[in-house]
Amino acid sequence: MTVRDWDLRHFRLLDALAEAGSIGAAARLLGLAQPNASRLLDSMERSAGFALAERSARGSRLTDRGLVVAGLASEVLAAATRVTHAVDALAGQGGSLHICSSLTVAEHLMPAWLATARQRLPALSITLDVGNSASVFERLREGSVDLGFVEGPTIETGFHYLDLLRDDLLVVVPAAHPWAARETVGADEVASATLVVREAGSGTRQVAERALAAHTAESAAPSRLEVGSNAALVASVAAGLGPGVVSRMAVSPELLTGRLVAVTVPGLVLARTLRAVWPSRVPLSRETGEFLALVRSLIDG
């Protein structure tokens, strides 16, 4: 292989290595196994005839020559994106946008956003996949989606974020539960209870566990009932399987009918920020920018 055989995979690796600072972190950004990324870098160095990165026990970093090549690689990637947009425009297409959204956003906000997008951006083709916050980051890293929406506290490197709105989580119980008749419930009581929670990787679960950790004894290992969706969580709480922690948006119908009751827990902070997220290594596409502008206009009223 010669340098003339390099393709976008090679340029993406250099761009990610410049951003992440190590071959392992660059591999994670690209959704590659580290050995595969290392082999790709080795083949690039052989074809270039000089070292692109310095290896050490602390990781890998680009050499001075590597930084020059990485800067040019970034320009190539930006040009490739512009070519894609130009071809779409010349073909008279409105473009496409592939979104992966966490459950709360997908179930309670995305339908209105998509309906408005159909009216205001009729030529834009949108595909929506749904998962938890961890899977959103995974899909973005592997490059299979353009834009994500997450609801957890985790801020991962290699991404741009746009804060959208605040979402409050509530501790809820059935109307017949003893806590429903109390003015307040202690945070330590909630932390030690058998709670119905979302699965690991869910933003709802992350926020709940972080908030409850400060009120949980070090030796304690409270039991949890894990469910894979907001609807399953609400139904499990209503069936008496235990108190639950869930977004206000997901449980508002049950609160209005009195089927479930929100419990006041002084000192337990369960607020979170819903965010849009996209890879920092990829220029923001016209389609992504248009959809984000639409979302902001709907939120800001």
Where are the language model's segments positioned?
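Flexible hinge/capping segments at coil-to-helix
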Residues: 159-196, 200, 286
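Secondary-structure junction motif
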Residues: 179, 194-216, 284-293
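Central regulatory/effector-binding core of bacterial HTH transcription factors
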Residues: 94-157, 218, 227-229
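Short helix-boundary/capping micro-motifs
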Residues: 15-33, 59
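Alpha-helical linker/hinge and terminal dimerization helices associated
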Residues: 47-48, 69-91
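A short LG(V/I)-centered, amphipathic sequence patch enriched
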Residues: 43-64
